Amino acid sequence: MKRILSLVAILLVTGQLTYAQNDTIWRTGGLLSVNFNQVSLSNWAGGGENSVALNGLANLFAKYKKGKIAWDNNLDMGYGIVKQGEEKIRKNDDRLEFNSKFGYDAYKAKFYYTVLFNFRSQFAPGYNYPRTDSSRYISKFAAPAYTLLALGIDYKPKDYFTCFLSPLTARLIIVNDDSLSKAGAFGVEAGDKIKQEFGAYLNSRFQKDIMKNVNFMTKLDLFSNYLEDPQNIDVNWEILLSVKVNKFITASIGTQLIYDDNTAILIYKDNNGTKTPVLNDDGTQKTGPRTQFRQVFGIGFAYKMSGFGIR
């Protein structure tokens, strides 16, 4: 599998160096937004706490198209913090993902032989709240990180839709932290910092103004590991709906659903509205893969960078 990784990397880098010349044509653009939410209460009979939240996101793209060559790049980033009552500041969003596809036209500019590279991680340490001391973090930048190289076919019937399918995909799970790797976090063997997987991969993305001042984006990633429990498919599905109120104000709602068979999550049961840990026979708390879900809504400043060409 290391030979496959090396071959795919050489093909990707060679193709990018060959075609990224001065006579190329690029289209670039994206969306930048900052959302702010604040609640202030004084002698409020209904109860509640003061809160402040700030979220920022960026969805950027750079696309090259000339002759039979197509090269698409997407960078998606998100980070958010919230302070509620007397609690310390906590993050409520943290995403970093880069996706690059280099393709050669196979049929009528709709099907492309494609090499894909994907990197996904986060910016800052994550904690199992309310414990936020620096020794209790459960994730950080590059712990985990997911890198993926794939050979396959990309279907691009329209500029706003693409669906890539690969039966030959190498994926690395990286846990670049001693304490987390010793604990065997995110599916690596205890003491190891890298887990290698080989399987099938699907990557689909749709982004379009579905009506005036309304932009809809959704992307779906599916991965099946041939080497271990291929029936347990990893899922990463994101949706972002943005509604432009005026030139600079935008309302947006985003969701993300993740299922990762390598990620062990603490298991709780609902006991009359109270979360109660589910314990093993030895008294330790049970862990296992679970469906993760995140939803963010906000109103704030947004700037849409319309695509422009560079020749």
Regions found by a protein language model. Give the residues of each.
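Residues on the lipid-exposed face of transmembrane beta-strands in outer-membrane beta-barrel proteins
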Residues: 30, 34-36, 56-64, 98-104, ...
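Transmembrane beta-strands of outer-membrane beta-barrel pores
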Residues: 34-40, 66-68, 77-83, 117-125, ...
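Outer-membrane beta-barrel translocator domains and adjoining extracellular loop/strand segments
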Residues: 41-46, 85-89, 126-132, 175-182, ...
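Extracellular loop and loop/strand-boundary signature of outer-membrane beta-barrel proteins
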Residues: 43-48, 83-88, 132-139, 187-192, ...
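Outer-membrane beta-barrel "beta-signal"
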Residues: 291-311
